[in-house]
Swiss-Prot record:
Keyword Nucleus part of the UniProt annotation: yes
Keywords of the record: Acetylation, Nucleus, Phosphoprotein, Ribosome biogenesis, RNA-binding
Example of a GO MF term: RNA binding
Keyword Acetylation found: yes
Extra information: Present with 7720 molecules/cell in log phase SD medium.
Listed PROSITE patterns: RIBOSOMAL_L30
Organism for this UniProt entry: Saccharomyces cerevisiae (strain ATCC 204508 / S288c)
Name of this chain's protein: Ribosome biogenesis protein RLP7
Gene name in the database record: RLP7
Coiled-coil portions: none
Chief location bin: nucleus
Modified residues (Phosphoserine): 14, 278
Compositional bias annotation for Polar residues: 1-16
Protein purpose: Involved in the biogenesis of the 60S ribosomal subunit. May act as a specificity factor that binds precursor rRNAs and tethers the enzymes that carry out the early 5' to 3' exonucleolytic reactions that generate the mature rRNAs.
GO biological process: exonucleolytic trimming to generate mature 5'-end of 5.8S rRNA from tricistronic rRNA transcript (SSU-rRNA, 5.8S rRNA, LSU-rRNA); maturation of LSU-rRNA from tricistronic rRNA transcript (SSU-rRNA, 5.8S rRNA, LSU-rRNA); ribosomal large subunit biogenesis
Length: 322
């Protein structure tokens, strides 16, 4: 009788095979990730050593130094101007207002409408419509895409800190940002390194559904890892305290800039976008040249402290990158 009771206790205390298999898989994946991280660190060390021994021409050093000094001077001008605005010392400033310059391409075959000349400037040569407006300080939803900055420029420390704060460390990544009076000066500092625009609801939904990723730690997992956001149960588990139970609630909260906008925004990882043109073939090289020409028309750099923030048609850009 006692032997049968002992056998029952042993069967009850034994772990199911599924749990044991999950633990083995979790241990194996953890070891594989540690090995991959170790290999990545070793490759980075080798790359740093090879870059140290790399020959650098004197002309490239001079060009990089001059470009970086110009960029530092631009950021210094912007910082001084914003400091004067904060202290209300706008007597000797050309304009104490904040401006946004919206640049869009003309629609083919579109009829020219009568537009106020003070607010809109049109140039028939390049086929672009430029509309300069005054920012009134009202909150607005922006989508910011990190792009390559000016040629041969080492990003100054202040601009890099702002990019890190916005989680835009890598190129071809994007985040949602709520534009306010406090955010506007930061956008002026990082203007050469980003593309800014106001997304539509369809673009917001497409981004979150196709490229939404989060950091999640499941059961029997040693470390959190990045997963695709395609499970409403995970959303309810992580954001249920804020009244958000599905992906559609996240889309609505971001589109309307609700009370839980920052919670939803930081719950999502920065969106990793595709390159507009990739590859090294002859046709791809031609497309890259055309892309640079188009960017030179829309992305107009200015070293002036009072330069407006440039806004582009972000929906058309996301249609190419998403």
């Amino acid at each position: 009788m006692s032997s049968t009771q002992d056998s029952k206790a042993q069967t009850l205390n034994s772990n199911p095979e599924i749990l044991l298999r999950k633990r083995r898989n979790a241990d194996r994946t953890r070891i594989e990730r540690q090995e991959l991280a170790k290999k990545k660190r070793e490759e980075q060390i080798k790359k740093k050593r090879s870059n140290k021994n790399k020959f650098v021409r004197a002309e490239s050093i001079v060009a990089k130094t001059l470009a970086t000094s110009r960029e530092k001077e631009r950021i210094k001008r912007v910082s001084i101007l914003e400091d004067k605005k904060a202290k209300n010392e706008t007597q000797h400033i050309a304009s104490g207002k904040d401006f946004i310059l919206k640049i869009t391409e003309k629609a083919n075959g579109a009829e020219e409408n009568s537009v106020d000349l003070e607010e809109t400037e049109e140039e028939e040569d390049d086929g672009l419509i430029r509309e300069k407006t005054t920012y009134d300080g009202k909150p607005a939803l922006l989508f910011i895409v990190r792009v390559r900055g000016p040629l041969a420029v080492n990003i100054p420390n202040k601009a890099f800190k702002i990019l890190s704060l916005l989680r835009l460390v890598e190129t071809n990544t994007g985040v949602f940002v709520k534009l306010t009076k406090n955010v506007y000066p930061l956008l002026k500092v990082i203007a050469p390194y980003v593309v800014i625009g106001k997304p539509s609801l369809s673009s917001i939904r497409s981004l979150i559904q196709k490229r939404g990723r989060i950091i999640y730690k499941g059961e029997n997992e040693a470390e959190p890892h990045e997963i695709v956001l395609n499970d409403n149960n995970i959303v309810e588990e992580q954001l249920g305290d804020h009244g958000i139970i599905c992906v559609e609630d996240i889309i609505h909260e971001i589109a309307t800039m609700g009370e839980s906008f920052s919670v939803c925004n930081f719950f999502l990882q920065p969106f990793k976008l595709n390159r507009e043109v990739s590859g090294f073939g002859s046709l791809n090289r031609l497309r890259k040249i055309k892309q640079r020409e188009a960017e030179s028309r829309t992305r107009q750099f200015s070293n002036a402290a009072t330069a407006p923030v440039i806004e582009v048609d972000i929906d058309s850009l996301l249609a190419k990158l998403n």
